[in-house]
Design a protein with these regions (language model features):
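Phosphate/diphosphate-binding glycine-rich loops and adjacent basic-rich segments that engage nucleotide
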Residues: 148-220
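A generic, well-ordered mixed alpha/beta core segment in the N-terminal half of proteins
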Residues: 80-172
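N-terminal nucleophile
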Residues: 157-160, 167, 182, 238-270
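Secondary-shell segments that build the walls of catalytic and ion/ligand-binding clefts
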Residues: 196-258
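N-terminal glycine-rich anion-binding loops that anchor highly charged ligand groups
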Residues: 5-11, 25-51, 65-76, 266-269, ...
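Catalytic-core signal marking the mid-to-C-terminal active-site face
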Residues: 3-7, 12-15, 22, 250, ...
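Active-site cofactor/substrate anionic-group-binding motifs, chiefly glycine-
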Residues: 48-102
Length: 361
């Protein structure tokens, strides 16, 4: 496959679903995982898209990822619930967690959902969008257990994960306002994408094993490993620390320290604490009008007419629209790794080649 090739999203979805069916996932599980990964690529976040498949296959083969498992209720009290993800596909248990939280928010006006011990839950904005589609605000604090990748402010090595923070606000007859980012300067997956492409990352994102700043993504992919830096120095570090506590400790899960370190970088375990709010719970009849007035006010001051001001989440909306028409781009290195993973789990070569022909057409 040539670099820069674009794949039809629907055909690619069928292939990804077939990969997980080959791995042993039941039909609904394979669909939910494929839905999520393709949606991440369509939204422009390739770091959380189908490029994760080789890591998932390795995690499963090492006994970390548990297929065909579901979230288990640990404690439930009114509007609050704590769930054990049972090391299942995060794309499954997070979907179940958000569905339960939405149900509680309909009933109580507000819900708090704590999920721990889940395998990688992917792009957090996807779960916020699930809440927004139901008309709800949601706030998400996420931690990554036992795989330190990010150095604290003034730190010399990695001490915690990329710990995403996410907020969504639904809008009437318009796309939701969505804030979703890792508290590291860039997501770990973006170093993987850059490494496969053979390109540097922006300055201010990485340090090498000696703590020296670098733009070489190999320091996050090849030993000896360096570390990501937090965004905005002490501000990103402080938010990352709160995500570690609210996402990890408060959810009933673990925080990252000497006793919780994982032996495999593919054993990605997430914890997430989510607050889901029905905006009608508040006495704010003018809320939508005020939101739109602010949006119009902000967008009306571009410095350059060729670079319009985007609202939070608008970049994803635009990228999704473009990729649905033009296809999902994938570099040759990532595609080769996905095909190798498919072979590793026993997908027949003729089946793989048949999909390749469909995708190339």
């Amino acid at each position: 496959m040539e670099s820069g090739h674009r794949f039809d999203a629907q055909t690619l979805h069928s292939f990804i679903q077939a990969v997980f069916r080959q791995m042993g996932s039941e039909e609904q599980e394979a669909k939910l995982v494929a839905d999520h990964l393709i949606a991440a690529n369509l939204a422009g976040h390739d770091s959380h898209g189908i490029g994760m498949i080789p890591s998932y296959v390795r995690s499963w083969s090492q006994g970390h990822l548990q297929i065909n498992h579901h979230a288990k209720t640990v404690k439930e009290s009114g509007a609050a619930v704590t769930l054990d993800g049972d090391r299942a596909f995060g794309q499954v248990v997070a979907h179940e967690a958000m569905a339960l939280g939405i149900e509680k928010a309909h009933k109580h006006g507000i819900a708090a959902v704590a999920l721990h011990n889940s395998h990688h839950i992917g792009r957090i904005g996807y779960w916020a969008e699930q809440c927004a589609a139901a008309g709800f605000v949601s706030i998400h604090f996420v931690s990554v257990v036992g795989i330190p990748m990010v150095a604290p402010f003034h730190g010399r090595d990695s001490r915690f994960g990329t710990n995403p923070f996410c907020v969504v606000f639904p809008r009437k007859d318009n796309f939701p306002l969505l804030l979703d980012y890792a508290t590291s300067a860039i997501a770990f997956g973006k170093t993987r994408v850059a490494w496969h492409k053979g390109v540097p990352v922006p300055p201010g994102c990485l340090i090498d094993v000696n703590g020296v700043p670098t733009t070489n993504p190999a320091v996050m992919q090849e030993s000896p490993l360096g570390a990501l830096l937090t965004f905005a120095e002490h501000k990103g570090y402080a938010l990352a620390a709160m995500c570690e506590i609210l996402g990890g400790a408060l959810s009933g899960g673990k925080t990252t320290h000497q006793e919780t370190l994982q032996t495999s970088p593919d054993a990605i375990l997430n914890c997430m604490t989510t607050i889901i709010i029905n905006p009608e719970l508040f006495g704010a009849p003018d809320c939508n009008a005020q939101t739109e007035a602010f949006a119009e006010w902000v967008k009306a001051s571009p410095h350059d007419d060729d670079k319009p001001i985007l609202l939070p989440g608008e970049w994803e909306v635009n990228t999704r629209r473009e990729r649905q028409k033009q296809g999902i781009p994938l570099d040759a290195g990532s595609w080769q790794a996905i095909c190798d993973a498919a072979r590793q789990i026993g997908m027949p070569e003729e089946t793989l080649q048949a999909f390749c022909q469909q995708l190339a057409s």
